[in-house]
Regions:
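Internal helix-turn-beta structural module
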Residues: 305-343
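Conserved, mostly hydrophobic/aromatic
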Residues: 53, 262, 328
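Conserved phosphate/anionic-ligand binding catalytic regions in large, soluble enzymes, centered on
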Residues: 49-62, 324
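Short acidic, Gly/Ser-rich segments with clustered Asp/Glu that frequently serve as metal-coordination loops
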Residues: 55-58, 257, 265-271
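Active-site-facing alpha/beta catalytic cores
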Residues: 8, 67, 80-245, 266-271, ...
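N- or domain-start disorder-to-order transition segments that initiate the globular core
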Residues: 1-44
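Glycine-rich phosphate/diphosphate-binding loops that line cofactor/substrate pockets in enzymes
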Residues: 38-46, 251-257
Length: 343
């Protein structure tokens, strides 16, 4: 294979977990959080979930400070909200160019180092849990890599570019925590619902060189993130009519645990990141006017960091996104407290 250079064999997930293990106390903390989060998706709890954090987790110190502040907000809103830090360590790139995340580049200004990356992502997710008591969310960009973090993640997202992929769907069917399926960039919600259907059913397939059986994931659910029309324009899909339509399509499909997370950024905001608080509040307004919508909406995804906006790699502004722009901490704190007040 002349076009592919096999540089070195990486440790398998079992080896990485043995080298960087979870303590029994952290494993129990994670399990307790898993139960609380599952109760939201099954309807046993009426709390809302906020999957919130930077577009990309680019440096450990800033992410840990952000999550420490988030833990303080969790204490203030514990009766209303469950906060799940968004610690995204691998990033899909539309053209294949640009920063691909901590997994690829533990140092954004250096070349890729996948061995160091595997260690870095496990260390970061572990440290967030150990330092703050908050278990984390990440995107499943590469299904084969999920096992490196399977004992740590409280929430898994499948992105708009991956949601039609069979390997993502089948792997999601073997995950024991909620997996959110985003609508594709075309906006076709039938694709998203078919992905949820596949993830909720058992399968047999090849995974990491093994023949595996899965039991299905009843916590697989929908994420609306807006879409792009044929003219390249961003079209939102969080308005009342779209939410009612999704509920009806969801119910007609006969899926378990009808549930939706609304992504307040991406095409829903046309990447105008300051719109995220307004979008969350509009969805909450819709919840007050429809019992169907209220029962379906389980929370939001918000892109947020210590500093608002974004920067180019190499500018070295601490706590500011090097990928998509995010709201800063003051706006984050206000949004979280406002949501808790409104529900």
């Amino acid at each position: 294979m002349q076009n592919m250079n096999f540089k070195r064999k990486l440790p398998v997930p079992k080896e990485i977990k043995e080298q960087y293990p979870l303590t029994a106390a952290l494993a129990q903390l994670k399990q307790d959080r898993d139960t609380m989060i599952a109760d939201v998706f099954t309807g046993r709890s009426d709390k809302l979930i906020l999957i919130i954090g930077p577009c990309s987790a680019d440096r450990e110190d800033a992410v840990l400070e952000y999550c420490d502040r988030l833990a303080g907000l969790q204490e203030k809103t514990a009766d209303k909200l469950i906060l799940i830090p968004r610690v995204y360590t691998n990033k899909p790139r539309t053209t294949g160019e640009g920063y691909k995340g901590l997994l690829h580049q533990p140092d954004p200004e250096k070349q890729s180092d996948m061995l160091e990356g595997v260690i870095a992502i496990r260390r970061l997710h572990t440290n967030v849990l150990a330092n703050t008591g908050l278990s984390t969310a990440d995107e499943m960009l590469y299904p084969d890599n999920y096992r490196y973090l399977s004992d740590l993640l409280a929430y898994v997202a499948v992105g708009a570019r991956s949601v039609e992929n069979q390997e993502h769907r089948l792997t999601a069917s073997g995950i024991a925590v909620p997996v959110g399926m985003k609508n594709p960039t075309s906006g076709d919600i039938s694709v998203m619902l078919n992905s949820i259907l596949a993830a909720q059913h058992p399968h047999t397939f090849i995974y990491r060189g093994w023949e595996v059986d899965t039991t299905g994931n009843p916590l697989a659910h929908a994420i609306l993130r807006g879409y792009v029309n044929r003219h390249g324009e961003a079209i939102p899909n969080y308005h009342f009519e779209e939410l009612e339509h999704l509920y009806n399509a969801y119910a007609a499909k006969g899926l378990e645990n009808i549930a939706l997370i609304v992504d307040a950024n991406h095409s829903n905001s046309a990447k105008k990141y300051r719109e995220q608080p307004r979008i969350c509040k509009e969805v909450l307004h819709s919840c007050r006017h429809s019992e169907h919508i209220r029962s379906m909406v389980k929370g939001f995804m918000v892109e947020s960091y210590l500093e608002g906006g974004s920067q180019k790699i190499g500018e070295h502004i601490y706590g500011k996104s090097i990928t998509d722009p995010c709201i800063g901490w003051a706006d984050t704190e206000k949004l979280v407290l406002d949501i808790a007040e409104l529900i």
